[in-house]
Amino acid sequence: MLGLPLRIYLATLLLPTLASAAEPTRHLCFSRSDAIWLANLDGTGARKVVTGVDPAISPDGVRVAYTEPGKGTVRHIAVMELASGNKTVFEKLPSDNAYGPVWSPDCQRLLFRIYIGDHWRLGLTGTDGSAFQFVGEGSPANQDFQSPAWATDGKSIYAQDLTNIYQLDLTGKVLAQWKISDAFSDADLNSNDRIEPTEDGKSLLFDADLDADGPIKAWEGPPPAIFLFDISSGKSRRISPPKVYAWGPCWLNAQEYLFTSTVDGRHFGVYKLSLTGKSPQLVVSNASSVTVSAR
């Protein structure tokens, strides 16, 4: 029979192992060429999982939602179970042109853009494509909604229409509204920009186009940068370093975020940076459009 001191010693040796075993395994999901890839949080162990674009790994890390391109303008939302490889393609939506799925925090619904009657609208559906509904109609400015994102409580969403930023309930009712020109003093939004709320719901992570020329000659258009928008004040501040082209942000944790960047306008990679950091760290080369599981 083991003595008490020896048993205590062995227990202390086991504690770190047990704690590590209890920690969730988080993953990165990103685009590479015409396919969607999965990797460990540090970028190692990358593997191709499916052909498609606009990857969004579910918060629980069990499934990935994405856009499956077809011929011409045909695009469908699809969901794949990562363990089995089984996938469901949403072919019964009211349009054959839908893209950019975003998971609800509880992993039960998907939000995306869908083309109806010459306008992009926001669609909401279950993870099997059932129970489809529109989120309102056009924006109050009579423009198309862009950049949909879930609020952290799953009861409302954020979007923008190139004129204003909105918080909407799931019927499309406007809960809050901010002018983009007031929120960004030296930048503007485009239809492909991403919104990422903080876990505490007090701020939004944005990418936006700077009102300035950039140093990369091979880059067409204004240089992109990452901003943190404070909901209470309605103002934003740039957090990505000067001269760094940064877009497509997502939260890694409360103090760090991931984003896509390039140094030459031709080759892309996923980088990591803290909110106050100045030197981005490469996580995955030849990658873009990153999302990360929460657990």
Question: Language model features by range: what are they?
Answer:
Residues P5-T17:
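Bacterial N-terminal signal peptides
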Residues A21-R295:
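Sequence signature of WD/YWTD-type beta-propeller architectures
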